[in-house]
């Protein structure tokens, strides 16, 4: 197929956001053994997320404390989010050929990766949505590898969202890169339930991960989405060379943004990308990160996203018992995920009910 010419998205003129978590003005608190007790009082009892310094203290806990940490994060999830798990499927409408240089992504046209540009037609979108709904999922996200949508892509989204909503009883979400105000308004008018646009990593680390656009541009799109009344899905990719301090910084920045959902991706190093030789995140470190983000975001949907298979394997059950309350079923955009039956069996074994569509409306 012939790849479309992707028009650069013109971002609205806005003042770059000032995030209070960028600068710590108070004296650093000493790392102590009471962080879990403090988290129990503040997060479990009061529903207030940990700040950046306390998230860092959690990330620095020794392996011996991991069991207690996961148990606390699970209690927080149950108290403030409930026992249900939200299930989502995703589909790539436009794959590959992206003009951006996100160093972890094999869909960038700037890297020598095996992913080639391709488009999916509307009937295929509808069939994928039907298959997703058959798993019990309440969310179906249409994703495109672009800087932002051009006219062709918006026309395809217009047609695809209408066809899915007519044929399938499922919430439709989109992930189409950076948006203009006009595009945000149109997506909201189409009935798009949720929009995904990840911060990816901490503001201080972002220039080492992406150079073709700024962290502030991503933040601006997220703010536009929230203002338009769509639910905001904004998450992270863990393991892209960030320090623990920067991981805590990101958690605090996400808390300041207040998204409805935070998907946690773990780096699955892709051949041909600048981060293709980075190591996968250690499983214990990944579980600590999940729990730390739950303690920073006690009321937020925290979703398993890409990379959990290579990072955690069968230990992904521990993440479900350590703060996670949503999953993506099936394959990801360019990598394989677990088959849906395996994930659904895991939820059944854990006696975790799947959130009904009515509960999301």
Swiss-Prot record:
Family matches, as Pfam families: BATS, Radical_SAM
Catalytic activity, EC: 2.8.1.6
Cofactor, free-text remark: Binds 1 [4Fe-4S] cluster. The cluster is coordinated with 3 cysteines and an exchangeable S-adenosyl-L-methionine.
GO molecular function: 2 iron, 2 sulfur cluster binding; 4 iron, 4 sulfur cluster binding; biotin synthase activity; iron ion binding
Domain of life where this protein originates: Bacteria
One GO term (biological process): biotin biosynthetic process
Keywords, in A-Z order: 2Fe-2S, 4Fe-4S, Biotin biosynthesis, Iron, Iron-sulfur, Metal-binding, S-adenosyl-L-methionine, Transferase
Role according to the record: Catalyzes the conversion of dethiobiotin (DTB) to biotin by the insertion of a sulfur atom into dethiobiotin via a radical-based mechanism.
UniProt similarity note: Belongs to the radical SAM superfamily. Biotin synthase family.
Official protein name in the record: Biotin synthase
Native organism: Parafrankia sp. (strain EAN1pec)
């Amino acid at each position: 197929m012939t790849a479309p010419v992707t028009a650069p998205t013109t971002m609205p003129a806005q003042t770059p956001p000032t995030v209070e978590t960028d600068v710590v003005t108070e004296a650093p608190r000493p790392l102590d053994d009471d962080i879990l007790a403090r988290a129990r009082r503040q997060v479990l009892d009061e529903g207030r997320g940990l700040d950046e310094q306390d998230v860092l203290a959690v990330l620095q806990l020794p392996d011996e404390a991991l069991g207690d940490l996961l148990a606390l994060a699970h209690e927080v999830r149950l108290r403030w989010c409930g026992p249900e798990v939200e299930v989502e499927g995703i589909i790539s409408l436009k794959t590959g050929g992206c003009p951006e240089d996100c160093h972890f992504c094999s869909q960038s046209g700037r890297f020598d990766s095996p992913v080639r540009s391709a488009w999916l037609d509307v009937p295929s979108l509808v069939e994928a949505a039907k298959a997703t709904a058959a798993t019990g999922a309440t969310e179906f996200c249409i994703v495109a590898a672009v800087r932002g949508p051009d006219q062709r892509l918006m026309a395809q989204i217009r047609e695809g969202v209408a066809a899915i909503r007519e044929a399938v009883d499922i919430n439709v979400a989109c992930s189409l890169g950076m948006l203009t105000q006009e595009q945000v308004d149109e997506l909201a008018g189409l009935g798009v339930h949720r929009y995904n646009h990840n911060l990816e990593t901490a503001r201080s680390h972002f220039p080492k991960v992406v150079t073709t656009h700024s962290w502030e541009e991503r933040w601006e799109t997220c703010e536009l989405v929230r203002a338009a009344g769509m639910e905001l899905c904004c998450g992270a990719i863990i393991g892209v060379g960030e320090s623990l301090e920067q991981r805590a910084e990101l958690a605090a920045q996400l808390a300041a943004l207040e998204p409805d959902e935070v998907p946690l991706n773990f780096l699955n190093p892709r051949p041909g990308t600048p981060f293709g030789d980075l190591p996968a995140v250690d499983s214990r470190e990944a579980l600590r990160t999940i729990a730390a983000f739950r303690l920073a975001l006690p009321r937020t949907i925290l979703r398993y996203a890409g990379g959990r298979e290579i990072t955690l394997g069968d230990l992904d059950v521990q993440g479900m018992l350590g703060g996670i309350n949503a999953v993506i079923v099936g394959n990801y955009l360019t990598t394989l995920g677990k088959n849906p039956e395996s994930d659904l069996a895991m939820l059944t074994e854990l006696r975790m009910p799947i959130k009904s569509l009515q509960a999301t409306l």
